[in-house]
Amino acid sequence: MAGLPPPNKTPEIKFTKIFINNQFVDSVNGKAYSVINPCTTKKICDVQEGSKADIDKAVQACKLAFKRGTPWRRMDASRRGHLLYRLADLFERDIAYLSSLETLNTGKPYKSAYQDIVHCIQVLRYYAGWADKNMGQNIPVDGDFFSFTKHEPVGICGLIIPWNYPMLMMTWKMAPALSCGNCIVVKPAEQTPLTALYCASLMEEAGFPPGVVNVVPGYGTICGQSISSHLDINKVSFTGSTEVGKLVMQAAGSSNLKRCSLELSGKCPVVVFPDTDLDFAVQQAHEAAFQNMGQCRWSGSRAYVHESIYEEFVKRSVEQATRRKIGDPYELDTEHGPQIDEEQYTKVLDYIKSAQEQGAKLKYGGNKHGDKGGYYIEPTVFSEVSDNMKIAKEEIFGPVQLLMKFRDLDDVIDRCNNSDYGMAAAIFTNDINRIMTFTNAVNTGTIWVNTFHHWFPQAPFGGFKTSGISREMGKYALREYTEVKSVIYRIPQKDS
């Protein structure tokens, strides 16, 4: 990759404590837990383990920062934008370190981690620009009255971050939240807290006042639950599984009816018609299934291929999988790293076993890769998969591509929609009528046409059905972090 700075294979671990009120502090109970390198299964470091008491401290810091008359509340909206621009500049300055640290903690290839940070910078700058433009309206009403709306921050937002894209998902949530003037409590995934803690130090350097940003590492069952049920948190944003998302929503509703944004599980279809460039479609379907080792909510694991090109597509897909470079994520030609931890590693292998037991044909992979440790699984390709198999219905979250035949457009639309999930879908064809029918009929939050895995700060992202509620990115995300206040007052005389 041209212009890619060299990675640091042994990045210094600079911050391992909880960040509250612009200070790094020990946990209230003094506990710590080990962070593991998925490439080696060895410990990277110990990080302070947050608890309910630490979440309470972070929320209290937010409450003080959000009081009327504080520097944060009195700050001009344009100044909030300047802080986000400054944060983006600091990300850019430290991009090699952030990418190296993300690679160490997640095992994802360095070049992928680098692209994640590039996207983070773009998102920060996009929402920096929105800070003084998220305005209300003047509304014509009957009689001698004047009406207008104000967009105000929700208040204290709890942001629960997943382990598959730690920096990316943190930025997707915190950038619009801060642009709108909220205070935040960030709970990174217990597996991947290191870049979030370093990011906290950059927030202070950028000039965010104390208490505006707080980062509390810890386990979801403790810290995540505490955020979801906290009576002083006004909004929770969660990315993770549908199963846990339901628990978050229940806790949010049964506590103080806090606002809830959920980006949840997916089982995304990729549809290939014979009029497309076959080599390009094979390559795109390959990346759709195997990007980030399949650890994506938008992973295109279900590939529906027209029956007239199916056998050739299977052949070329296997050839593509054999060429995928697995190994040291710091090597710039590495495309494939480990799964995040032992639990996920075991879960994926169990899914592969169940597919074979149910009659799917294993064409490539299906095993642990290498004998030097690490949670590596080979890129795995199955053919002759039926829609009623467990592996075709449930989210795998691993490097498994399922290749299935279809007859015609109506057939494949019905099969795409025959899922509890609705995160994303893709179609490869040159027929505009087919494209329009597909995009209108398929029930997903995003549809890619002749591409996959492209998103932009300006465009919203989120799921239908049990893939979630609300949207991240774009103008739509600002709605998730604002309250709309309607003001109506009598005037002596209205003139048009």
From Swiss-Prot:
Cite the InterPro entries for this sequence: Ald_DH/histidinol_DH, Ald_DH_C, Ald_DH_N, Aldehyde_DH_dom
* Function recorded in the entry: Omega-crystallins are structural components of squids and octopi eye lens. Contains relatively little if any DHAL activity.
Q: In which tissues is it expressed?
A: Lens.
Q: Name one GO molecular function term.
A: oxidoreductase activity, acting on the aldehyde or oxo group of donors, NAD or NADP as acceptor
The entry's keywords: Eye lens protein
Superkingdom in the source lineage: Eukaryota
Q: Which Pfam families match?
A: Aldedh
Q: To which protein family does this belong?
A: Belongs to the aldehyde dehydrogenase family.
**What name goes with this protein?**
Omega-crystallin
PANTHER family linked: ALDEHYDE DEHYDROGENASE-RELATED
